[in-house]
Amino acid sequence: MLGDGNAGMSTIPGLNQIQFEGFCRFIDQGLTEELYKFPKIEDTDQEIEFQLFVETYQLVEPLLKERDAVYESFTYSSELYVSAGLIWKSRGDMQEQTIFIGNIPLMNSLGTSIVNGIYRIVINQILQSPGIYYRSELGHNGISVYTGTIISDWGGRFELEIDRKARIWARVSRKQKVSILVLSAAMGSNLREILENICYPEIFLSFLTNKEKKKIGSKENAILEFYQQFACVGGDPVFSESLCKELQKKFFHQRCELGKIGRRNMNQRLNLNIPQNNTFLLPRDVLAAVDHLIGLKFGMGTLDDMNHLKNKRIRSVANLLQDQFGLALVRLENVIRGTICGAIRHKLMPTPQNLVTSTPLTTTYDSFFGLHPLSQVLDRTNPLTQIVHGRKLSYLGPGGLTGRTASFRVRDIHPSHYGRICPIDTSEGINVGLIGSLAIHARIGYWGSLESPFYEIFEKSKKVRMLYLSPSRDEYYMVAAGNSLALNQGSPEEQVVPTRYRQEFLTIAWEQVHLRSIFPFQYFSIGASLIPFIEHNDANRALMSSNMQRQAVPLVRSEKCIVGTGLEPQVALDSGVPAIAEHEGKIIYTDIDKIVLSGNGNTYSIPLIMYQRSNKNTCMHQKPQVGRGKCIKKGQVLADGAATVGGELALGKNILVAYMPWEGYNFEDAVLISERLIYRDIYTSFHIRKYEIQTHVTSQGPERITNEIPHLEARLLRNLDKNGIVMLGSWVETGDILVGKLTPQAAKESSYAPEDRLLRAILGIQVSTSKETCLKLPIGGRGRVIDVRWVQKKGGSSYNPETICVYISQKREIKVGDKVAGRHGNKGIVSKILPRQDMPYLQDGRPVDMVFNPLGVPSRMNVGQIFECSLGLAGGLLNRHYRIAPFDERYEQEASRKLVFSELYEASKQTANPWVFEPEYPGKSRIFDGRTGDPFEEPVLIGKPYILKLIHQVDDKVHGRSSGHYALVTQQPLRGRSKQGGQRVGEMEVWALEGFGVAHILQEMLTYKSDHIRARQEVLGTTIIGETIPNPEDAPESFRLLVRELRSLALELNHFVVSEKNFQINKKEA
């Protein structure tokens, strides 16, 4: 956030700032913190000592560039070097060397990491903050039961509770509880210290029996008693050092380590002044917690809201990378310790470089980025998706919640989310409410809390000062929720304003306000902030819209939206998709793949992205926007990327839409479109698919890449070059060979031809046999080969196989079955493509491009699309673009409607088209049926909304099966497009066929075409020779499976076959 202290104006922060700040914090602080924790390592005889000198660590600049790392499938990382010393105590000398510890993956300019050529991003996680929390529950007898839960930095917890007899317990597990006296004594306090440090000693003395005194008579007795209760050990355990270590490891380390954040929270909650560097739970903490618990029993003190953001902390990319670095150093310590012992045992002279290996650090980060739930493959469908992915917040992951156990209260919106977590943007399905998105202006504070900016109002002067508040601080202020000065500081303030105070919304006088919000979009995420007129939509539809905008496919010819919100340039800029000038100067050369800039006496070459595949198979491509000889400034857009125009986000198209029914073809969520969208390539997109194959070294020899493949038709091999790899620019169809490969295999003696056996017997020549394992183009993959990569790893062994990647580009026009959507949750499937002459047309003769169902608006309460539709029509006629801030009713009532009608009226006057704005039915117009030329009976709403084409396309989903694989157990066709599966004929499908009376078709569906093995085999032979297909006599395989499963439950089920000739009953074994 940038702010001017005098004017108090603010700008929107960098949308990738959260990721950059987290990684910089890890490099600047996290690395040194973990390196300082690395211990000095000695051998068993204490003759050799190994230590690291942290002050001299350095990270080397990467050898590879980002683009090369992606192209060659490497990791974009930096080598970490640290000085280490090996001290020989007997000789008194030290050997010091700079050692290589390992590679640390770096963050690139997009705020992501490149691991093995794949863009990955680390998601921020929301966890319960360590500390103590008090809550109350109604017991079985209707009396409130108060408990205090202490949560450690590791996520471990134990509870303090008071029973009906006023005895205080520490519940260490679900079934086991220990007296608070025993716990305090086991932590090192005696009875006298306990009674001196509590406010209610009489309650402790009331349940202090002679037996209890004996248990806490000494620290050893208390530890034995605590261990016996905690570990559920019978008998009389004996006090020993190993017992203390086990208790320390299993209980105190996991449940009593508070960390810095936990110590701060504990001090604030219990009014303690224990130093911040003392991060372990002390007896003083436990006794103060018990005092507060007793006070709650007597009606003093306050309970905690576990879902308040002040009781949560953000585990950012810095914390996750630091944890992994610490884990790698622990593994490195074990390796060094073992190596030193081995060197001493074999009487070798170790050196620091011989002791240290880079494997622990490299493998730890590889496994973290590849396997950790919070490390995800970056979604690169469009520029908006890239930005939003890095700003996600997840309650899931290690130490967090799970989708099946999280309660509704956790998922729900909380007042403390105001200005920090978007109340709209979340995932749909089982994880709803558990994966959120950061508000635009929110940032992560030093203590892991989410902070939001506000303007502080001074009564005497008109100056304002911007400050960031954590969730625990803004409860003490009255925050004006929606005042008009957020945009226009010069206008007079209203007398009464809506205000938020202590999680309640009030209406108070302006003089009582302490803070005010800084921006209308402050409460929303990026996805929700791109929805114009969002205040007129139901929140559920706004949620769908913010999710569907991330699914929009970049089009061949992108177009800026007529009606937007003003955030489009910021999103496009921060996504890194457009090429931006980093220096000012003059363009001296421009090409399709680079731009050369001359400035400050230097020449800069800016490479452009050409037909790069995203991980969602969309096409990333940059188009130069500046010509030779043009002078440019720093920060100017040089080239537009996918889904950007002029440096602004452009996900869809402004097209002419009518809201009316048309012959039932737009029933429910179906959409009728004009063929103009196809012929003019309005919704045409490019998709790039990647196909790869690996060559291994088998036990029979290495696999070969060749164009000489026996037993295959020549037309399938027509596109291969002399090396056996498909040629660039080739047009390939389904079934064509992309890479020819032969795998050697051992053949049996009987499989050899007679001439082969003769050669072996006379000359001893071994005739090799190979199996064809070529890479073939699957169904639906037809297209043009645009790139072929042969990635050869070092060694070339079976552990480092060679990989050949083939990239095929497809041009996809919009067709029936594709999904389209607006920005208000109005989605639909293309049901029919009409000729232009049959589409309804306007009074000026223009046919509409798309027809939506009007019944999809009122019931779903997303009226914002109507405002956008009408304003887009006015903007198209006036050649204007509008940027609308949300909640414009703060200025006056019906502000949105007045704006739309005034613009329509002006468009009607300037274009001399009275039908654009007719006072009898404003926003609507009489249109004509393209088939007959007759006007429709009622006026129809027409306009120009912004419609997106989504990635859910029919080419990826439609599938048909003629023959394929069957499941081994049920013998039914497999399910799924990827397995060449078939459609299951279930109960409802059987009922439908029964309703039509198609008995023979139904029998085929349930026997020949499904799981009747013998009948399936007979069908082929009888079809070839032209005989009738015999009726199956025994049961199908799924019925036999059911019988066997019932038998396993001790239920016998038999079936009988009645002969058609003599009606004899024959029992058949199922």
Curated annotation (Swiss-Prot):
GO terms for biological process: DNA-templated transcription. GO terms for molecular function: DNA binding; DNA-directed RNA polymerase activity; ribonucleoside binding. Keywords: Chloroplast, DNA-directed RNA polymerase, Nucleotidyltransferase, Plastid, Transcription, Transferase. One of its GO terms (cellular component) is mitochondrion. HAMAP family: RNApol_bact_RpoB. DNA-dependent RNA polymerase catalyzes the transcription of DNA into RNA using the four ribonucleoside triphosphates as substrates. This is DNA-directed RNA polymerase subunit beta. It comes from Citrus sinensis (Sweet orange).
